[in-house]
Amino acid sequence: MEIIPAIDLKDGRCVRLYQGDFQQVTVYGDDPVAIAQHWFEQGAPRLHLVDLDGARSGQPVHTDIIRAIVRSFGAPVQLGGGLRSIEAVERALELGVQRVVLGTAAVEHPDMIAHLVAQFGDAIAVAIDARNGMAATAGWTETAAMSAVDLLERMVTLGVRRVIYTDISRDGTLSEPNIAATGALVRPDGPAIIASGGISTLDHLRRLADVGVEGAIVGRALYTGDLSLREALAAFQ
């Protein structure tokens, strides 16, 4: 199982939100490039970058920071937030981003997802962000009339190969991930599942590995020191 540190970008800084609430922000650094360097030096196999301002506005905001991270280290980066058009996805990939993560577009424009998967294959991942079992969009500020499970089924029909699942109520809480809901999305012939939200201990990671996820995105727990990236990586080599 791959352990992936998260860097969430807001106002040019590295932050974490509590349950996706833009009014509950904790700043963990003013230099996201230096933070990226730290995680790569700790052995991170890739980084999960989220342009929070982009997610809320509908178009990428932190392009310069993302470019600097990608070009400074030459290591794999996956990017989400504000990627709601084919052009935005193409520009992100041109920056050197290895994998783009689409959330709102998956709900609102499934035809676009099908086009992108056909064109870019593994470079396209879909974020299924759930609040009370229902898919959330627009930087988690809106809730769609579609369940997370139904959204997964739709993505399967479109050929999506990788899904990042987040239970919003757990995100940024350090409580624990929603193991049951995450495991319900894992199918032998389905897309690879990456878990996110509430992960803060090695036991959480082990339980996620037991249900068959491909990877786990860890944010706040790494910044608070509740979880050591080196220890987590060593446990899942």
Curated annotation (Swiss-Prot):
InterPro entries the UniProt entry points to: Aldolase_TIM, His_biosynth, HisA_bact_arch, Isoase_HisA-like, Isoase_HisA-like_bact, RibuloseP-bd_barrel
Record keywords: Amino-acid biosynthesis, Cytoplasm, Histidine biosynthesis, Isomerase
Cellular compartments annotated: Cytoplasm
Active-site residues, Swiss-Prot/TrEMBL: D8 (proton acceptor), D129 (proton donor)
GO terms for MF: 1-(5-phosphoribosyl)-5-[(5-phosphoribosylamino)methylideneamino]imidazole-4-carboxamide isomerase activity
EC top class named in words: isomerase
HAMAP family: HisA
Family per similarity comment: Belongs to the HisA/HisF family.
Protein name according to UniProt: 1-(5-phosphoribosyl)-5-[(5-phosphoribosylamino)methylideneamino] imidazole-4-carboxamide isomerase
Provenance organism: Roseiflexus castenholzii (strain DSM 13941 / HLO8)
